[in-house]
Amino acid sequence: MARTDVLVFQHVAVEHPGILRDFLRADGLTWQAVELDLGEAIPDLRDFRALVVMGGPMDVWEEDLHPWLRDEKAAIREAVVERGMPVLGVCLGHQLLAEALGGEVGKASRPEVGLLEVELTEAGRRSDFLAGLPERITSLQWHGAEVKRAPEGAVVLASSPISAVQAFSVGSRALGLQFHVEITPATVGEWAVIPAYAAALEKTLGAGAVARLEREAAERMATLNRTARVFYDNFRKVTGI
């Protein structure tokens, strides 16, 4: 039986791989999403070539509220350590990847929300995961927690004034991104219906923030999507997926 190319861990329906789905389809790659927040079981990792872990409104330490987080972290650790699978973590997925591999995650000094810049570190400028990208990248941020300490052996690839670990890699198989590269024209509107996200947005950017962010994202969408394509192509090239 042929393996599915990509397994996707989702934590809320609206936080899906976004434009990355279009890239996968165009390249003829197959993918399967598992909605962990709905109680869907994690399948056998041997049936997949790669793992993508998306964002969500919960925090990595909320295992009492979301017991499935324990199994998810174990699966991420299995994918990286035992199976050497290509793994991409985005936002919450970035934090889960870090914690699963022995890093530390906690509350950020303040929420980081909006279209903001991250800066590549010296190691990031040399990394094949980030090849072809400028030293400063504008991307969508929407988080209140952060990676406080990257896993042992990880390389920090990008940072911002609020969060020092905006991106990290572990060898040539695992990549974590705190920021969102998967954004589409529908992203801001879809995420704003989640109470926790809407509250963070309004608290950080003020009343009317949803409409303003939607306009700003629309104006920059072409550039944001080109950046996503570079990330996607680099990830495929480096990991061999």
Task: List PLM regions with ranges.
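Extreme N-terminal starter segment of soluble prokaryotic enzymes
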Residues: A2-L7
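Cofactor-binding loop segments of dinucleotide-utilizing enzymes, especially the Rossmann-like FAD-
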Residues: F9-H11, L36, L92
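Glycine-rich His-Gly loop
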Residues: Q10-V12, V53-P57, G144, F179
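Short N-terminal binding/cap micro-motifs at the start of the first secondary-structure element
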Residues: V14-I19
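Flexible gly/pro-rich beta->alpha loop and the following alpha-helix that scaffold active-site loops
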Residues: R21-L88
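Catalytic nucleophile loop
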Residues: V80-E104
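Pocket-forming structural segment of enzyme catalytic cores
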Residues: L101-A186, E190
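Acyltransferase
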Residues: I183-I241
